Regions:
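Structured adenosyl-cofactor binding patch, chiefly the S-adenosyl-L-methionine
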Residues: 123-161
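Short glycine-rich anion-binding loops that position phosphate/pyrophosphate groups of nucleotides
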Residues: 28, 85-88, 116-119
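N-terminal beta1-alpha1 ligand-phosphate binding loop
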Residues: 17-44
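S-adenosyl-L-methionine/SAH cofactor-binding core of RNA-modifying enzymes
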Residues: 46-110
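Short, Lys/Arg-enriched N-terminal segments with co-localized hydrophobic residues
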Residues: 3-17
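A mid-sequence interfacial segment
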Residues: 102-138
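A structural signal for isolated positions on well-ordered beta-strands in alpha/beta enzyme cores
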Residues: 19-23, 50, 111
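Conserved RecA-like P-loop NTPase ATPase core
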Residues: 22, 81, 115, 148
Length: 161
């Protein structure tokens, strides 16, 4: 059996289930965007939403504390995808291929991290396994959270065929 066939057989025998995490900085709000986000969360198996608040007025300290919360949400052997306006623009199919590759390499946890109002500090940018953007526009955090949930749903649909 050649290497490619063995890999396909292994993939079929051992379906790794990926647990998704959406971790975000900011207060939970009862907004229309949150309602849509929760509709997508109900459609996706193995997903968690974690929201954190950092209460300090010092921007540098805030960035550092936010980074630690988002980084620490990623399990030890998981992958961290950071949403950042300067990140790489990917198609849904490209992102699905990245996640499928990670899954095929036994990654079971993927954390999509959304920073706070001051953006993302260097610590989390240096720690992230992938930095992506939803275009060059700046989006409200509530909308980004909703868009991430939708993309995870879309990725799972692409992967399942």
């Amino acid at each position: 059996m050649d290497k490619k066939t063995r890999r396909n057989v292994t993939r079929c025998i051992r379906k790794i289930i990926v647990r998704y995490i959406i971790s975000t900085i900011g207060k939970a709000k009862n907004s229309d965007e949150d309602m849509i986000t929760h509709k997508y969360l109900k459609r996706i198996k193995n997903i968690e939403l974690k929201q954190y608040e950092v209460k300090t007025n010092n921007p540098e300290k805030k960035l550092e504390e936010e980074a630690l919360k988002l980084i620490n949400t990623t399990p030890k052997n998981g992958k961290l995808i950071l949403l950042d306006e300067k990140g790489q623009n990917l198609s849904s199919t490209d992102l699905a291929k990245i996640i499928l590759n990670w899954r095929d390499n036994n990654v079971t946890d993927i954390n999509f991290a959304i920073g706070g109002a001051f953006g993302n500090g260097e610590k989390i940018k240096n720690t992230a396994d992938k930095i992506i953007a939803f275009g060059k526009l700046t989006w409200p955090h509530q909308m980004v959270k909703m868009m991430v949930a939708e993309q995870i749903y879309r990725i799972e649909t692409i992967i399942q065929g």
